[in-house]
Design a protein with these regions (language model features):
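Non-catalytic C-terminal accessory region of glycerolipid acyltransferases
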Residues: 2-4, 8, 113-231
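Alpha-helical membrane-targeting segments
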Residues: 3-29, 87-104, 179-186
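Helix-to-loop junction immediately C-terminal to a conserved catalytic motif
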Residues: 21-53
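Short, basic, glycine/proline-bearing loop/turn elements
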Residues: 23, 102-109, 136-139
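Short, flexible loop segments at the rims of nucleotide/cofactor-binding pockets, characterized by
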Residues: 23-29, 108-113, 143-144
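Structural motif corresponding to alpha-helix initiation and N-cap regions
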Residues: 32-35, 93, 116-119
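Catalytic core of membrane glycerolipid acyltransferases/transacylases, capturing the structured
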Residues: 41-112
Length: 231
């Protein structure tokens, strides 16, 4: 991965941070909780933030929840390949490809049926100590409820030993700009306690695809617990 795509997310996210913080923190109603759960995470080691996926605003809201000087910024992301967005109308100009990459979103090598190949770019980022935002459900919710997670998130914890921080985003589902401006919704970003390999798997066993799905189910359960405690 070129240095340009490692540096550009830091520049963009830092430049936009004052505006997103002002928008979400002052104009909108929002609440950030659980940052104290990250206090003892080691610096220089990759961290996965496992987030429920409710809207296109999710990748903007997550970095805005951190302080400007946070060691967890910039945030990198998993995304779909550019051709996935070919039926997205005018938005396909921006979705995928260059515009996603400069924000920190890199495509999964989907369809390979191999986690190491699918997550190749993201494994590299984590090995370099970056923060990775991943949406375990693999797509945005259609009814506002949490969906079943895919196994890739747990695979990263197993392969790299990196902590998985469950994150719940609330109030964004089917949120309109009018709702935002009129402050009809309260938005929330809730960070849970980190989960580790031993929280997701039994010690010493050989892993299968079903084991990774079961491990991700533990992560989704932690996100569900955060949802229950929100507001």
């Amino acid at each position: 991965m070129s240095k340009f795509y490692l540096i550009s997310p830091l520049i963009l996210q830092k430049c936009l941070w004052p505006f997103t913080w002002l928008f979400f923190g002052v104009i909108c109603r929002w609440q950030v909780s659980g940052l104290e759960n990250l206090k003892y995470l080691k610096t220089g080691k990759g961290i996965v933030f496992a987030v429920n996926h409710t809207s296109e605003m999710d990748p903007i809201l997550v970095p805005a929840a951190f302080p400007f000087s946070s060691k967890y910024l910039p945030m990198f992301y998993t995304s779909r390949r550019k051709d996935f967005y070919s039926n997205s109308g005018w938005r396909q100009i921006f979705y995928g490809g260059f515009f996603f990459k400069i924000w920190g979103a890199h495509a999964l090598n989907s369809g390979k049926r191999n986690y190491e190949i699918s997550l190749q770019n993201h494994i590299e980022l984590l090995k370099e100590g970056k923060s990775l935002c991943i949406f375990p459900e693999g797509k945005t919710t259609r009814d506002g409820n949490l969906m079943e997670g895919r196994g890739g998130t747990a695979y990263l914890a197993d392969k790299l030993g990196c902590p998985i921080v469950p994150v719940y985003l609330g109030g964004l589902f089917k949120l309109s700009f009018k709702d935002l401006i009129l402050r009809r919704r309260k938005l929330s970003v809730s960070f849970g306690e980190p989960l580790y390999r031993h929280d997701l798997f039994h010690k010493g066993e050989m892993r299968s695809a079903s084991d990774y799905k079961a491990g991700t189910a533990v992560i989704m359960s932690a996100i569900a617990d955060l949802k229950k405690r929100t507001f």
